[in-house]
């Protein structure tokens, strides 16, 4: 994995959950496991529409194009499988209604766009999705909005969750890092930080300078920890398998610590590691049989997969992992989002 040059709040939070997850993220050989999901697609749509509030082209045109682009990427990531249509994405209808209302509240203001690629901020606020880099520390980030209200400096992060309330500890940490970046750039510590929902509600807190400094310090420690592991090796002791950390991790099929630690009562999609004993194609679908290696409660049981998306038909003796399928041991059928991963020969 590549060392971290500038850590972002997202990477810091991920390291706090599991350092191995970030190592997978920064390993180019694992790129095929990183794919968009309906949830991330909808989140991207919401952020894009919020940036364009008041655009002269109108809500419907902006919304429809954002959805079409997100769905195209989703299809590209999962081809030849066909992901669910946008109308069936969780939260799609409610997000659309809330954004339409936000659009109406915004009037006909100029489009909320600023190139995120520019690291040098403009002379005046507001800043919208502008990348900020700390001049002395290995930290960078892109706050959604930095603005001044009644002479008070605010840092805002837009959240697309349907039940957002006060910032969670992770959201608070993210905002505090952004505050540190704004302070380093402007020379002024923000007074307030807040998460903002698609309804326009803001859940704020007063920014404490000491808390900001502590958060920046934790980010530097995380960079040092990760880069030390990148230089010396990512041992399994650096992984932190747990239900919350692993539930949405795209690398479960490649992660030995997860497969060794996973418990039967973890509320996580089925994942299995198996050694192939036979493989064939019937009615244009792969039918692959194997013997389970992990998880522990299925060891040595037979596993038959039907229609799984193997890049090439597996060979007898190979070891494969699969996740997000329909069924379980002893037999399972592929879903649109089933992922397979061939383990290297031991």
Task: Label each PLM-derived region with a short phrase.
Residues 49-128:
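A non-catalytic, helix-rich entry segment at domain boundaries
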Residues 291-316:
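Beta-strand/loop nucleic-acid-binding surfaces
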Residues 29-30, 258-268:
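Short cysteine/histidine-rich zinc-coordinating motifs and their immediately flanking basic loops
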Residues 263-290:
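Structural detector for short beta-strands of small beta-barrel domains
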Residues 213-248:
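Polybasic (Lys/Arg-rich)
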Residues 121-216:
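Mg2+/Mn2+-dependent nuclease catalytic core
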Residues 9-58, 251:
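Nuclease catalytic cores
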Residues 325-346:
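OB-fold/S1-family single-stranded nucleic acid-binding modules
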């Amino acid at each position: 994995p590549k060392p971290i040059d500038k850590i972002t709040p997202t990477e810091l939070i991920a390291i706090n959950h599991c350092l191995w997850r970030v190592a997978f993220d920064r390993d180019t050989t694992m790129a095929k496991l990183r794919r968009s999901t309906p949830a991330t697609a909808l989140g991207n749509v919401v952020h894009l529409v919020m940036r364009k509030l008041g655009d002269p082209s109108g809500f419907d045109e902006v919304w429809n194009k954002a959805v079409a682009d997100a769905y195209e990427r989703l299809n590209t990531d999962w081809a030849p499988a066909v992901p669910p249509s946008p109308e069936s994405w969780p939260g799609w209808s409610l997000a659309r209604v809330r954004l339409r209302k936000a659009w109406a509240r915004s009037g006909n203001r100029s489009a909320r766009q600023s190139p995120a690629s520019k690291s040098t901020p403009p002379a005046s606020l507001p800043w919208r999705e502008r990348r900020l880099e700390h001049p002395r520390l290995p930290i960078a980030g892109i706050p959604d909005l930095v603005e001044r209200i009644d002479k008070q400096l605010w840092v805002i992060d837009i959240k697309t969750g349907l039940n957002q309330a006060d910032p969670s500890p992770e959201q608070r940490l993210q905002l505090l890092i952004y505050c540190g970046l704004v302070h380093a750039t402007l020379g002024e510590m923000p007074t307030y930080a807040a998460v903002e929902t698609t309804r326009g509600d803001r859940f704020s807190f007063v920014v404490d300078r000491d808390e900001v400094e502590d958060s920046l310090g934790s980010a530097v420690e995380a960079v040092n920890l990760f880069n030390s592991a990148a230089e010396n090796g990512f041992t399994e002791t650096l992984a932190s398998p747990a239900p919350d950390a692993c539930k949405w991790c795209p690398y479960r099929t490649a992660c030995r610590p997860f497969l060794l630690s996973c418990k039967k009562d973890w509320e996580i999609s089925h994942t299995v590691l198996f050694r192939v004993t036979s493989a064939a194609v019937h009615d244009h679908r792969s039918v692959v049989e194997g013997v389970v290696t992990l998880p522990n409660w299925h060891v040595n049981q037979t596993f038959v997969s039907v229609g799984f998306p193997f890049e090439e038909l597996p060979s007898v003796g190979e070891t494969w992992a699969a996740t997000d399928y329909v069924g379980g041991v002893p037999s399972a059928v592929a879903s649109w989002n089933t992922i397979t991963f061939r383990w290297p020969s031991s």
